[in-house]
Structure formats: C-alpha cells, structure tokens
C-alpha cells in the first residue's frame, strides 16, 4: 500500500473566460471544482493505475468535507481534522493564459501539528511507500518533512519527497534522508545557487555533491526532454517521445505516482523510470489534473528509452 501525504490541500476552482476584464464583472458559466493539492493528484493517479492508496493530510471546515466527499471511494481517506478551513485555489483561464489566485491556507496550532504527527505514525502500519508532496501549511516548521521522513525511516518505509524551497533545503541538511527526491531544473538551480541546464556532465557532477549524500534516488525533471536520474552510483537519461499536450498541470505529481508504484513493487531501475515517465505523459494528455487514461499506457511505455550515461 502507498500512503500519500498532502499537508496543505485545497479545493481547486477553475474559471474559464473568453476574456478577463479588470475592474468590472466577469460572469462564469462552466465552473470546475476538484480536490486539489499535489499529494491528492498522486492519489488519484495511483488509484487509476490500480494501486491501493491511502490519503492523509490536514483538512478543516466545509472545504475539507468537500475534499473527502469528492475523492474516489476506492481511495482510503485518512485525513486529520483541524479547526481552520482548508484553502481554495482559483485558476482563471483566459485568452490562452492561466492566472492563479492561491490562498495561503489555515494556521495550524502546535497541538494540531503534534496531533498529525501521531496520526501519521498510526497510518504507517500497513504501508510500503510514503509520498510527501507540496507546501507546508502556516505554523508548521520548515523541517517538518524531515520529522515525518525520520519516522518513516525508523519504521522501514520508503519515502518520495516532492517539495521545494525551505522545506526541501531543511530535509537535505537534516540527518534523515528520503529514498527519492524529484526536483526540476529550476528547483535544482535554486538549491545550488547557480543556473543548471540539460548538460549531462554538469548534472552528474552536481548530483554527487555532499548536499545529496544519503539519498538513494535523485530524479531531475527536464520537462519535454524527459528525465536525468541518479540511482546510487548509476546515472540515467530518459528520452521521451513528443506528444500532444492538453495540460501539463499535475504531470510532475503523476510522475511521483509512478515512482512510488515502482518502489512499492520492487521494480528495477529501467522499469521504475519508464513507468514514472509514462504516467507523467498520460496526465499531460488529459484535461483533468491527476488523471490518466490507461488505454494509452502500453504504447507510450514502448516508446520510452532509458539509457545509462
């Protein structure tokens, strides 16, 4: 079983407009509301793929109830209730652009943070892999993911971390390391304080930096150019075919789902990397975020090339 953690979930609201007019009324006909947050995208893709998945995080208010009520019944909802209201994130789709308005989310108390920590420990009993995705809610310290990873490691669970900024830096500087991290080039550049490109030799060099010591897998997203990955002392380039993209939103989360599935099933390096990239591409071919059409899986799987470099 795979446990997905979304500490700062949201209701994602989409407003499609032919034109966004400022300082006046804009009327929307076709409004879409879905449970949002990176970890919930991971949950839905794992569910589409047929994995047994358990979802947790911090939710509150009517927005939190909406999330529970609108997840597929086959996803085991094990969320921790807090007093604040779960946030709403608005995407205005207009003239080929996407303007986003993102709420910060609720402020968690010390008691609520401690309560979730105990809740997390309880959920690990029947789990093989834990995914930790997205931003931390207000009130949680930057090193909170480090705390959860330590608990998971002590219980023999593999962890996949997909976050950025201070939360990622705190984990890299801490004593307990995740099994996998999945930065993109921009996040890698931010971590290292210098611009990184798709130069394989340069990537090889920086991924051997002591900053990443103790992390078994480092999987760097190169966008439409695939992936550059390091597993222990072996490096891989994953070459993906060109596809028609409907929406790339959530494709990174779908890739995380593939990584988690590969770890849960003890797959070899090439199988894990191929599955992860296929799921990311399948999500990009769909209008709905965090959804994959498995009818296209085998064809894409055969088109991906994993090379040791």
UniProtKB/Swiss-Prot annotation:
Reactions it catalyzes: D-tagatofuranose 6-phosphate + ATP = D-tagatofuranose 1,6-bisphosphate + ADP + H(+)
Identify the keywords attached in UniProt to this record, alphabetized.
ATP-binding, Kinase, Lactose metabolism, Nucleotide-binding, Transferase
What InterPro entries does this protein map onto?
A: Carboh/pur_kinase_PfkB_CS, LacC, PfkB_dom, Ribokinase-like, Tagatose/fructose_Pkinase
Recorded GO CC terms: cytosol
Short name of any one Pfam family annotated for the protein: PfkB
Q: What EC number is given for this enzyme?
A: 2.7.1.144
Q: In which pathway does it act?
A: Carbohydrate metabolism; D-tagatose 6-phosphate degradation; D-glyceraldehyde 3-phosphate and glycerone phosphate from D-tagatose 6-phosphate: step 1/2
Q: Which domain of life is it from?
A: Bacteria
- Which Gene Ontology molecular-function terms are recorded? ATP binding; phosphofructokinase activity; tagatose-6-phosphate kinase activity
GO annotation terms (biological process): D-tagatose 6-phosphate catabolic process; lactose catabolic process via tagatose-6-phosphate
NCBIfam families tied to this protein: 1-PFK, lacC, PRK13508.1
The family note in this entry says:
Belongs to the carbohydrate kinase PfkB family. LacC subfamily.
Q: List, alphabetically, the HAMAP family matched.
A: LacC
Q: What is this protein called?
A: Tagatose-6-phosphate kinase
Q: Which gene encodes it?
A: lacC
């Amino acid at each position: 079983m795979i446990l997905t953690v979304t500490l700062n979930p949201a209701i994602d609201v989409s407003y499609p407009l032919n034109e966004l007019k400022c300082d006046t009324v804009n009327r929307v006909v076709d409004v879409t509301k879905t449970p949002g947050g990176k970890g919930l995208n991971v949950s839905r893709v794992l569910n589409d793929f047929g994995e047994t998945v358990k979802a947790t995080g911090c939710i509150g208010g009517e927005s939190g109830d909406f999330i529970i009520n609108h997840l597929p019944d086959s996803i085991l909802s094990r969320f921790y209730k807090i007093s604040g209201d779960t946030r709403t994130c608005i995407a205005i789709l207009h003239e080929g652009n996407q303007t986003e308005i993102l709420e910060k989310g609720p402020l968690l108390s010390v008691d609520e943070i401690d309560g979730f920590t105990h809740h997390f420990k309880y959920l690990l009993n029947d789990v093989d892999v834990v995914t930790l995705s997205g931003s931390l809610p207000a009130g949680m310290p930057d090193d909170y993911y480090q705390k959860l990873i330590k608990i998971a490691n002590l219980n023999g669970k593999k962890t996949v971390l997909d976050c950025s900024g201070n939360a990622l830096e705190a984990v890299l500087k801490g004593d307990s390391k995740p099994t996998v991290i999945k930065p993109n080039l921009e996040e890698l550049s931010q971590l290292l304080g210098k611009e990184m490109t798709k130069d394989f030799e340069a990537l090889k060099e920086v991924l051997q930096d002591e900053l990443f010591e103790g992390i078994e897998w480092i999987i760097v997203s190169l966008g439409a150019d695939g992936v550059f990955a390091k597993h222990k002392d072996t490096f891989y380039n994953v070459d993906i075919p060109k596809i028609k993209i409907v929406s790339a939103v959530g494709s990174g989360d779908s890739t995380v789902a593939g990584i988690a599935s590969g770890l849960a099933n003890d797959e070899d390096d090439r199988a894990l990397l191929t599955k992860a990239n296929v799921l990311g591409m399948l999500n990009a071919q769909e209008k709905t975020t965090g959804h994959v059409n498995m009818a296209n899986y085998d064809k894409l799987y055969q088109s991906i090339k994993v090379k040791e470099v």
